[in-house]
A protein has these predicted regions:
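Amphipathic alpha-helical polymerization modules
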Residues: 1-153, 175, 291-397
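Cysteine-poor, low-complexity segments in flexible/peripheral regions
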Residues: 142-303
């Protein structure tokens, strides 16, 4: 009796096994060639999801790192410009102090005025400087518009805005890359407090305002203090508010002058008849200080009121220097924050790369062993397939 053998079934089974082994070997070869454990998402869907998520985080980190480089370049340029402005303010203070020198002739003072005028022009050029992209550094968020210009009266006006340009350098931090020129150069704290002085001094007087403050922020009145000789070796004062006498008393240098919320302190030698008018001003513009210093330098060297105003200009230039120095320190602090943020991003990026490597990168020693095992299995399948292919019923007759 003939024995029936399902040769087709055996042939198909061995052929399928051969194909499976061939696919495994090809997969091992592709892994070894690419160095990657996962060649397509279907190899491990969960691992592929994590890899995709990590890649997105790495891409975001790279954007932050690129932003940090850009902001750092802008801030470093900003810091240098502020430092140059500091130097101009300090040099202007020195020149103005020299103008006060009583031994100076009118010609000497005019020579110093010309130097100051040159500094003022250079200062205006500096505050209108542009970065490598053509953006005006001190224009706030209007970088394409020149921020400072002189009007027909010679006063400097501001055409920018009061905001900072910012860029996102992390998910939680937007870093300012500039400071508006209005804040830096036109809103400088008044070194005399809440008021600025106007002097009407007698010959030989050395009287100067030291400080004047008022706790009543709504009091916008102008005050005038006039000093008189009390004929007892002391001075008295008369205080006017908007032209009306509101107080009179013996003057005490230690106590100063007090009226309601107003406090006025002076320094220097008083001459009977000296008068100081004070008007409200919490902040000042360094451009006005340049203009005023040059205007008062035209006065006679013997004009004590003009000399007192030049003293005021030296104090304002010094206050501007302090104000700019603080702004430069703030810019330096931002640069330090950028360095810290950059290091944090790089550390996190390294952690992500390690995590991604665990999911994605090939363990070569393990892969070589697997390739060797699959190659031997393929060889066995090929031998089995060869025998099955040659099998016929005549072998059993």
């Amino acid at each position: 009796m003939l024995t029936r053998i399902s040769s087709f079934h055996n042939y198909q089974s061995v052929q399928n096994d051969l194909r499976r082994q061939e696919n495994k070997v090809h997969h091992n070869q592709e892994q070894l060639a690419s160095g990657k454990k996962l060649l397509k998402p279907s190899d491990d869907p969960l691992a592929s999801y994590y890899i995709q998520n990590i890649s997105q985080q790495q891409e975001q980190l790279q954007q932050y790192l690129s932003s940090i480089v850009l902001v750092r370049n802008r801030l470093e340029n900003h810091e240098v410009n502020i430092a140059n402005a500091e130097n101009f303010a300090d040099e202007s203070k020195r020149l103005t102090m020299e103008m006060i020198n009583g031994a100076f002739s009118a010609e000497d003072r005019q020579a110093k005025k010309r130097e100051l005028e040159e500094i003022a022009n250079n200062f205006l050029n500096l505050v209108n400087s542009q970065d490598e992209s053509g953006n005006y550094v001190f224009a706030g968020t209007k970088p394409k518009s020149q921020p400072f210009y002189r009007d027909k009266d010679g006063s400097v006006q501001y055409a920018g805005d009061d905001y900072q340009r910012k860029m996102k350098v992390s998910s939680m931090l937007e870093m300012p890359m500039n400071d508006p020129g209005s804040k830096l150069f036109m809103e400088i704290p008044n070194p005399f407090g809440d008021y600025q002085p106007n002097y009407d001094l007698q010959n030989g007087s050395e009287l100067l305002l030291n400080r004047a403050t008022n706790v009543d922020t709504k009091d916008d009145a102008e005050y005038r203090v006039t000093f008189v000789d009390m004929n007892n070796g002391k001075f008295g004062y008369q205080l006017e508010r908007n032209g009306k006498v509101v107080d009179a008393d013996e003057f005490s240098p230690e106590k100063g002058i007090e009226y309601k919320g107003l406090k006025v302190h002076v320094k220097g030698q008083i001459t009977p008849g000296d008068s100081i008018e004070i008007e409200k001003r919490a902040e000042f513009s360094i451009f006005d200080t340049f203009k005023d210093a040059m205007a008062w330098s035209d006065k006679s060297v013997s004009d004590t009121s003009a000399t007192a105003k030049l003293h005021q200009m030296t104090e304002e230039f010094h206050a501007a220097f302090i104000h700019l120095n603080k702004a430069r320190t703030d810019a330096g602090a931002r640069l330090s924050t950028l360095d810290i943020q950059e290091q944090n991003h790089e550390d996190f990026n390294l952690s992500l790369a390690k995590a991604k490597s665990n999911f994605e990168d090939l363990d070569y020693s393990k892969a070589v062993i697997e390739f060797s095992e699959n190659s031997r299995a393929l060889q066995a399948s090929q031998q089995a397939f060869g025998k099955t292919k040659d099998l016929t019923l005549f072998n059993y007759i």
